UniProtKB/Swiss-Prot annotation:
HAMAP family: Spermidine_synth (MF_00198). It comes from Yersinia pseudotuberculosis serotype O:3 (strain YPIII). Catalyzes the irreversible transfer of a propylamine group from the amino donor S-adenosylmethioninamine (decarboxy-AdoMet) to putrescine (1,4-diaminobutane) to yield spermidine. PROSITE patterns: PABS_1 (PS01330), PABS_2 (PS51006). This is Polyamine aminopropyltransferase.
Length: 296
């Protein structure tokens, strides 16, 4: 191990994780972020932005299947999907597996990320960038949702942590724009961190989203790369019934969609909305947490 280069993640100040580096495939500071892609013997190709791992070939399927199939199958009739972020292409890959969807718009702030990932993480997108339903917009996500006149059935915020370029995707002005950009019966979901270590993120998101959506909650999955426990995904709609679909309904929709997944299944879908008590307590007993710009 001592003879190998080690790459250390810097998300948390007092502890973290390291990766052995077999080969650095790409390293560059783009217009918005410091990007590196390297190979690890256990996880395959790994992409990190600003010192924080974003995705690995080994376990990305868990994150992307849960971020897409949960809202899309809960909706049941989605035709237009908006992805905020998602430059590695895996979110697009999973959304494009739903043949009933007519339009997929992806808004990515950094064109460099898209270019690098198409070259160095081709398995993530798996050709999805060539889908005729796909449209790429290079823009800030906050600006897009507050300027567009389009309406979407599902909005997926594949945001980084609330630092650097990703910080604006945790603000009220972004959530308000997303609520306005959804069709009736639409669903908004977003990456919301590992709640055991980043509980404030979930509490702040819940507080802000509740101003614009009548049903706000979280669902979860365990993703090895994102250490510290379960990862939470924000869920926001105007229709509580979409979060409470029975197993039989989801099984029927899953079968009709013809999906073959490695992590997602209808039972996982139902169970993912069961949250640990410490998070439920935080959401009900902490009225407001300072730290993520709750005023904007």
């Amino acid at each position: 191990m001592s003879q190998k280069e080690l790459w250390y993640e810097t998300l948390h100040a007092n502890f973290g994780q390291y990766f052995s580096v077999e080969n650095v495939l790409y390293r560059e500071k783009t217009e918005h972020q410091d990007l590196v892609i390297f190979e690890n013997p256990e996880l395959g190709r790994v992409m990190a932005l600003d010192g924080v791992v974003q995705t690995t070939e080994r376990d990305e399927f868990i994150y992307h299947e849960m971020m897409t199939h949960v809202p899309l199958l809960a909706h049941g009739q989605a035709k237009k999907v908006l992805i905020i972020g998602g430059g590695d292409g895996a979110m697009l890959r999973e959304v494009s597996r739903h043949k009933n969807i007519e339009q997929i718009t992806m808004v990515e702030i950094d064109a460099g990320v898209v270019e690098f990932c198409r070259q160095y993480l081709p398995n993530h997108s798996a050709g999805a960038y060539d889908d005729p339903r796909f449209k790429l917009v290079i823009d800030d996500g906050v600006n897009f949702v507050n300027q567009t006149t389009e309406k979407f059935d599902v909005i997926i915020s594949d945001c980084t942590d609330p630092i650097g370029p990703g910080e604006s995707l945790f603000t009220s002005v972004f959530y308000e724009g997303c609520a306005r950009s959804l069709n009736e019966g639409g669903i908004f979901v977003a990456q919301n961190g590992v709640c055991f270590l980043q509980q404030d993120e979930a509490v702040n998101s819940h507080n802000k989203l509740s101003h614009y959506f009548s049903d706000v909650s979280f669902y979860q999955a365990a993703i090895p790369t994102y250490y510290g426990g379960i990862m939470t995904f924000a869920w926001a709609t105007q229709n509580p019934a979409l979060r409470q679909l029975d197993l039989a309904t989801l099984q029927n929709r899953f079968a009709q969609a013809g999906l073959a997944c490695r992590y997602y299944n209808p039972a996982i879908h139902v169970g993912s909305f069961a949250l640990p008590q410490y998070l439920l307590d935080a959401l009900t007993t902490i009225p407001k947490v300072i730290g993520l710009d709750s005023s904007e």
